[in-house]
């Protein structure tokens, strides 16, 4: 069904292209929203675009969308993206433990006695928690591995497709568009869920998940010169009252409120020639990392 809808929309867009012939083919910008594990549905969308031979000139992503978008922009084939995502131990990204196989015997004994380490520290002025429950070391390892083929690229305009990742300045609340530097660090900043992962310091700014400021960065694609925007929105729906039961669900609900509000603002920027896609992901959550094949298909 999604393929048929996209085909119809693209045919309508292609029919309008002769009107722009004097200035050349219109630039197509692909915008991928955040959404945790549901971001793997973006890969299914990429597969459809690839099958339909839709040209993509600009890729912009927030949070999970930045991870998928970065790989696609770096020139990785969709099939390889799928394989990499299935192989990766995404659940380990929510731990800083590098795995028992890599630990000395002494650490293994400590872990057996003290299986949970909340990252609490003590200083002269009192008891302190870290910037997030998770420092993000394992997430960094995963992203380094995923982007190893583009590790030497510092200007994201030099990737196979120009790319931007969107993060949020924790001090000001402003969106930060990252277009240069280390690709894995840019993704890491864009995916730094507040309170879960420690913020990332990049170019002197303290950055967290881009979904806080701009979860569906249509405006960024327009600023980069996109004439046609294909926006894929997998923003979480708000929880029902009966599903808000503990602290994590409360925090999650507040985060969803913020992302939905800024997403609605971005949706108003879409023009008639733009395409909005909202894959039907009912029954799946932002934590369903083991459902990669199903998410690929639903995308």
Q: Over which residues does each language-model region extend?
A:
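Patatin-like phospholipase
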Residues: 2, 21-62, 70-298
């Amino acid at each position: 069904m999604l393929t048929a809808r996209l085909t119809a929309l693209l045919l309508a867009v292609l029919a309008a292209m002769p009107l722009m012939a004097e200035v050349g083919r219109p630039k197509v910008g692909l915008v991928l929203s955040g959404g945790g594990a549901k971001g793997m549905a973006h890969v299914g969308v990429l597969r459809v675009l690839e099958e339909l031979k839709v040209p993509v000139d600009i890729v912009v992503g927030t949070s999970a969308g930045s991870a998928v978008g970065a790989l696609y922009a770096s020139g990785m084939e969709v099939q390889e993206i799928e394989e990499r995502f299935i192989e990766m131990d995404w659940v380990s990204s929510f731990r800083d433990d590098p795995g028992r196989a890599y630990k000395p015997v002494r650490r293994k004994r400590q872990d057996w006695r003290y299986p949970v380490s909340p990252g609490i520290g003590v200083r002269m002025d009192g008891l302190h928690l870290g910037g997030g429950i998770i420092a993000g070391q394992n997430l960094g390892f995963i992203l380094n591995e995923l982007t190893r083929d583009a590790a030497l690229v510092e200007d994201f305009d030099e990737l196979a497709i120009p790319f931007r990742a969107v993060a949020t300045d924790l001090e000001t609340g402003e969106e930060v568009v990252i277009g240069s530097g280390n690709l894995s660090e840019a993704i890491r900043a864009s995916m730094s869920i507040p309170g879960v992962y420690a913020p990332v310091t990049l170019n002197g700014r303290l950055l967290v998940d881009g979904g806080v400021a701009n979860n569906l960065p249509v405006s960024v694609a327009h600023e980069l010169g996109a004439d046609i925007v294909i926006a894929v929105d997998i923003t979480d729906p708000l929880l029902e009252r009966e599903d808000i039961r503990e602290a994590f669900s409360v925090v999650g609900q507040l985060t969803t409120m913020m992302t939905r509000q800024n997403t609605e603002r971005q949706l108003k920027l879409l023009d008639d020639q733009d395409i909005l896609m909202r894959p039907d992901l009912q029954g799946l959550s932002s934590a369903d990392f083991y459902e990669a094949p199903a998410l690929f298909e639903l995308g």
